[in-house]
A protein has these predicted regions:
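Metal-dependent peptidase/peptidase-like ectodomains
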Residues: 116-120, 132-133, 244-277, 387-504
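N-terminal hydrophobic or amphipathic helices/low-complexity stretches enriched
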Residues: 26-85, 263-266, 328-330, 552
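Extracellular/luminal Protease-associated
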Residues: 119-248, 252-255, 320, 346-348, ...
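Short helix-loop-beta-strand segments that form the rim/entrance of peptidase-like active sites
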Residues: 365-393, 417, 422
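Second-shell loop/turn segments in exported
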Residues: 31-39, 55-65, 97, 107, ...
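His/Asp/Glu-rich mid-to-C-terminal helical/loop segments that flank catalytic regions of hydrolases
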Residues: 366, 506, 510-554
Length: 554
């Protein structure tokens, strides 16, 4: 409540907004807020967003002073609300490393039966950024998409011969890429298509090196490399570093080289086969391909990739449960605090994306503190986590799932808030940012919030519907299997990938998304307060429930 803590005073505008949301909430509310939930008010949220998304923070990009300052601010607010510090050395920080790669000088490839003049660096081949540095050689084996997915009973390395000492030729992407019924998440690329996962599977199977060719079965067009060399290895250092999770790449010790479709076809044809035959009927086979040796195709290659490691951190704080048994089961409430940084005179403030979600975390922490003052505590423990490096590929959340503070098997649910302060507005013909989304106006979404992850846990969907009785929002359960791939574009995805029930709370994209126009004065703080109250109520209900939500694999 206002008189129980220090808060920034925003004057008449904040007071008026409080009045508006109070009326709106009263109109749609059929249940009282969860304990402490009445403290979640627009003026406090506005103060938090205004600080996090102010120009002085310079867009909070990973690795910048503004990003580090944001982390310190969140930690200080967690401390003020009495959260238990469960990070490293009794702090609120969970450290993790990211990696960037630069191209070295010595990179070459020699393929038997292919003249050296045809092997042009940057056009015919180049090292992948995941590559180890070193020299390797071996006979070539075609191994389909290079996927081993035991849960799907798919293994492209099942074979009667050993891969030891061989060079694996694999395709990028995955089987059934445009098949809605594919076990690999239908027509949306799954985690099994990630290059580093394929490389580690090949390395474990004994490969000395990996060659990655374009998937010509599913993708017609130029037969060059998967991506132009300049898009992977720009001639000048990129303005914004390209990060990877260090824990993934650190284990890669073998050379990894992207090659052109033409080179792959030449190698296969020299062995008396055809690439389309292998890529189609072979690689697309259910359960994986029986790896195919390519007779008389021998490769020698050298790669030089310099790795640099960068320390980063998530911010974590715990509300300890009071039940002696259930306290070992955790609810996670999460939001990412990084954004896109600054570009010359432009600052990408990231007010909605995602100062809004972080402000929600901060005010939920305070709501739990106030409930505790009234003697009300959750039965299960609740971890509040602010992830870093979401904009670089959910890297903070991936790092957590690789090294969780608490076992994922004892994580009951994850509630992720990302962009919770606007009305969804999809312009007609809006371009790549809005791919797969139907044109709609902001006015049609005034009271709406998207909830994703529902298809993986009907129990969690029902819990969200119950929690919404507190606020009367319009919950839209859509986009789980949409071509926009939204379900996989925020920090709930690493948890869903690990089988943990998770919801993505998201008021939707809009024309200011990832532009310098995403500023604090564009956020609807009244609506945002209701969204945060709903998430708080949902977390409280889950923490008190005698049962935990089930997870359904796709």
């Amino acid at each position: 409540m206002a008189d129980m803590r220090t808060r920034w005073i925003l004057g008449f505008v904040g007071s008026a907004t409080v009045a508006i949301v109070a009326v709106a909430a009263a109109q749609g509310r059929s249940e009282a807020p969860a304990p402490g939930g009445d403290s979640i008010q627009p003026d406090d949220l506005q103060a938090d967003v205004s600080f996090l998304a102010g120009d002085k923070m310079q867009g909070r990009r990973t690795g910048t002073p503004g990003n580090r300052q944001a982390a310190e601010f969140i930690a200080s607010r967690f401390g003020r609300s009495g959260l238990t510090a469960v990070g490293v050395n009794g702090s609120y920080f969970q450290p993790f490393d990211l990696m960037t790669a630069t191209l070295g000088e010595s990179n070459r490839i020699e393929v038997s039966g292919v003249p050296a003049v045809d092997l042009t660096f940057g056009t015919t081949y180049y090292p992948d950024p995941t590559s180890g540095t070193g020299t390797a050689s071996g006979d070539v084996v075609f191994a389909g998409f290079g996927i081993r997915a035991d849960a799907l009973d798919h293994n492209d390395y099942r074979s009667s011969f050993a891969l030891d000492g061989k060079v694996a030729l694999i395709l990028n992407h995955e089987p059934g890429e445009f098949d809605a019924g594919s076990p690999f998440d239908g027509a949306i690329a799954s985690e099994h298509a990630r290059v580093v996962r394929k490389v580690l599977a090949a390395q474990t199977a004994g490969a000395t090196a990996v060659l990655i060719a374009p998937d010509m079965h599913n993708h017609e067009g130029p037969r060059g490399t998967t991506r132009p060399r300049r898009s992977v290895w720009p001639e000048r250092p990129p303005r914004r570093p390209r990060y990877q999770v260090a824990g993934w790449v650190r284990d890669v010790a073998i050379p990894v080289v992207q090659i052109s479709g033409d080179l792959a076809a030449r190698m296969v044809e020299n062995a008396g086969l055809t690439m389309r035959e292998l890529a189609g009927a072979g690689a697309e086979r259910v359960g994986g391909i029986a790896a195919v040796p390519l007779p008389e195709q021998h490769v020698e290659l050298t790669t030089s990739v310099h790795r640099r490691f960068h320390p980063n951190r998530n911010v974590v704080g715990l509300i300890e449960g009071e039940d002696p048994v259930l306290r070992d089961e955790w609810i996670l409430i999460t939001a990412h605090y990084d954004h896109e940084g600054a570009d010359g005179t432009r600052v990408f403030n990231g007010a909605d994306d995602n100062a809004s979600g972080v402000a929600g975390l901060i005010e939920i922490a305070e709501a739990y503190r106030l409930a505790g003052l009234d003697g009300l505590r959750p039965r299960r423990s609740v971890l509040l986590a602010a992830w870093n490096s979401e904009e670089q590929g959910l890297l903070g959340a991936w790092s957590y799932t690789a090294n969780p503070i608490h076992p994922l098997g004892q994580t009951v649910a994850v509630l992720n808030m990302d962009m919770i302060g606007r009305d969804e507005e999809i312009p007609d013909g809006g371009g790549a940012r809005f791919y797969g989304l139907t044109a709609q106006t902001a006015a049609s979404n005034r009271n709406a919030v998207n909830v994703l992850g529902y298809s993986r846990s009907p129990d969690l969907k029902r819990a969200a519907e119950r929690a919404n009785r507190v606020t009367g929002l319009t919950l839209r359960f859509r986009y789980d299997n949409n071509a926009s791939n939204l379900l996989r574009r925020s920090d709930q995805w690493p948890f869903l990938h690990e089988g943990v029930p998770a919801l993505f709370i998201h008021t939707g994209l809009h024309p200011d998304y990832h532009t310098e126009r995403d500023r604090p004065d564009t956020v609807n703080y009244g609506k945002m307060a209701r969204v945060v109250q709903m998430v708080h109520a949902l977390s409280w209900n889950l923490a008190q429930s005698p049962t935990r939500p089930a997870y359904l694999s796709r």
